[in-house]
Amino acid sequence: MFGAPLLNEIIARALVLLVAFPVHEGAHAFVANWLGDPTPRRAGRISWNPLRHLDIVGAILFLYAGIGWAYTPVDPSRLGRRGMAIVSVAGPLANLLTGALFAIPAHFVLTNPSLDRLFGYGQIFPSLGDIMWFMVLYNILLGLFNLIPLPPLDGFSILVGIVPYPWAITLMKLQPYGILIMLGLVFLLPMTGINPVGWVFQAARLLSLRLVAGL
């Protein structure tokens, strides 16, 4: 997953980036605005325009490693714990739905070699099948990965929103350490033989295969 990607894979990820991240962050923004928080609207995030959502460092990391980030500003004081949980779950659900929808054209392209070769082929330019497959895989991966209940992922905000208030207060003490937790999750834990990110990736791959093959 973290090996040096081929050029065709980078190009395919770039195309995915223009879809998966705006879908995810746009869903957060739309739901937050719907629940009464004008912060995303004032920041110009009520949009599917990729340029309004992408973070340059997160985008570059996604192109190289398949994991990146973007950000939608919201005001927790306007949303409350329950509202934050609803806003948080919107992003992953939007990605899972997008991945499932892309599985339909992916199935037809990957089962028809003539369609697969319409766009490009080889190690330089991705084939149409490559693009469709990555659209499914990385939307599913982004959806599942963000459901991990650790800060700063969406799953953590969902967890904080559904547990009893005293538990939520205790959990929220972890928020300042979100970056350190992510570094440990992605880079340190795998050195011990425990690789949650790898498990999520394998689950995403299996689910994507079933979606594409099962149509």
Predicted regions located by residue number:
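Hydrophobic transmembrane alpha-helices and their immediate loop junctions
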Residues: 1-215
